[in-house]
A protein has these predicted regions:
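Hydrophobic helix-and-loop "lid/oligomerization" segment in the mid-to-C-terminal part
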Residues: 31-200
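Short alpha-helices
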Residues: 1-48
Length: 200
């Protein structure tokens, strides 16, 4: 996480870390690691988080604001993506979409969108989850997530996107239906290859 690097720079320069700075750095650590749940969490990450807590990071208010509070718009969008949910026959791939019209009508903030993909990813048995958002009439952003073995960075890279092994994104010229039809076969082929290798 970038906040780890910032913390090291501050320490190397001997600069004081106030409670406000500690709180800001803790926010970065927490959000970059999915509240310390992603596989990018190292023992160093946890040590720095503990040090930031000791330096006055307000973890209680952060917990409430980041993880235990939802706007009405976010709940509306969550309902929408669940109504549009698709799950593959083998249960390993799930996807949903938010149309450009819905995005235009609701005018969501970025915080209303953050974490929606996890609603799909957290379904039991799902390995790869994608949320398609119509950001323009013929422009779609796809957020890709995986749980255990799938490299979604590889999938996103096939279409000019990128990111991390467990979290990546890509922009597609076309509406959400087109984007879903484009990425779906690639996802299903990755799953097919993995399942075939597991059977050997």
């Amino acid at each position: 996480a970038n906040c780890q690097n910032i913390y090291h720079v501050l320490a190397a320069m001997g600069l004081p870390v106030t409670s406000d700075i500690a709180t800001a750095l803790y926010v970065g650590l927490s959000t970059d690691t999915g509240n310390f749940m992603y596989d990018n969490v190292s023992s160093e990450t946890l040590r720095i988080a503990a040090e930031l807590k000791d330096l006055g990071a307000d973890t209680d208010s952060l917990r409430l604001k980041l993880y235990e509070s939802c706007s009405k718009k976010k709940i509306t969008m969550m309902k929408y993506i669940l109504n549009n949910l698709h799950i593959s026959d083998d249960g390993q791939y799930a996807w949903s979409s938010i149309s450009h019209q819905m995005m235009t009508d609701l005018q969501p903030e970025s915080t209303d969108i953050d974490g929606l993909i996890n609603t799909i990813k957290d379904i039991e048995g799902v390995e790869i989850a994608i949320l398609f958002r119509g950001v323009e009439e013929k422009r779609t952003k796809a957020s890709l997530r995986s749980k255990v073995w799938a490299d979604v960075n590889q999938i996103a890279g096939m279409f000019g996107g990128g990111g991390h092994v467990r979290a990546s994104g890509v922009s597609i010229d076309g509406d959400v239906e087109y984007a879903a039809a484009l990425l779906g076969p690639a996802v299903e082929e990755i799953i097919r290859q993995h399942n075939a290798a597991e059977c050997k």
